[in-house]
Amino acid sequence: MGLKAHFRGSLPAGLIHLYTFPGGYCGMSAIENGLINVCLLVRQDTFQSASQPSPASVNQFIVWMGQQNPALGKWLSGAERIDESWLSISQIPFVTKQVVVNDILMAGDSAGLIAPVAGDGMGMALQAGRMASDVLGLYLTHQISAVDVRQRYSQLWWHTFGFRLRLSRVLQAFMLRPNWLTPGLMVMNAVPALGRLLVTHTRDTQLVRP
């Protein structure tokens, strides 16, 4: 499940700060009006067990999360939550989807949901919208058929995002499993170039054309 809230606190701009804890991870970034956007993803079973013996409680889970990662707990205790409560979402489908459904070209999360730790979902949605516009432009100018529209968009979408989605799911599997994450981080610390390589292959590092 995912949780999100806005805070007021100290956090350097221009960077995404990532904290891990057993069964999940939490990301922070500075946004407009001097606020900090805090989002986290956690396994449903981890959330439930951390909220016991009382009914599942977000606030109780946040306390538990801070105890698992002292650096994260220290930041949260020194920051002011602006939102009245945490926004939550569950049953997040990180599964393969159809890019064209009933002759409708899908974009954004409707086409494929990338793991937050590894991707720029909004950027992908904008890029897919541009791709759909380009393909439909060819159809409207009678250069390709309706069948070609479906085939071209699907092929272009998977060529652009397919590997990125698969790699993001592997990375997220490591992030949600402590027994995998610790040795994985040790390898990345020993080989810094590996981290840069992962960033390059999970995001579009090229400028979007006008």
What are these regions (language model features)?
Residues Y19-F21, Y25, I89, V199-T205:
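A general structural signal for short secondary-structure boundary/capping elements
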Residues Q52-L136:
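FAD/FMN-dependent oxidoreductases across multiple families
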Residues D134-P210:
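C-terminal helical "tail/cap" subdomain of flavin- and related membrane-associated enzymes
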Residues M1-Q67:
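Conserved FAD-binding catalytic core of PHBH/FMO-like flavoproteins
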Residues P12, K74-W75, F163-R164:
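Short, structured loop/turn "capping" segments at alpha-beta junctions
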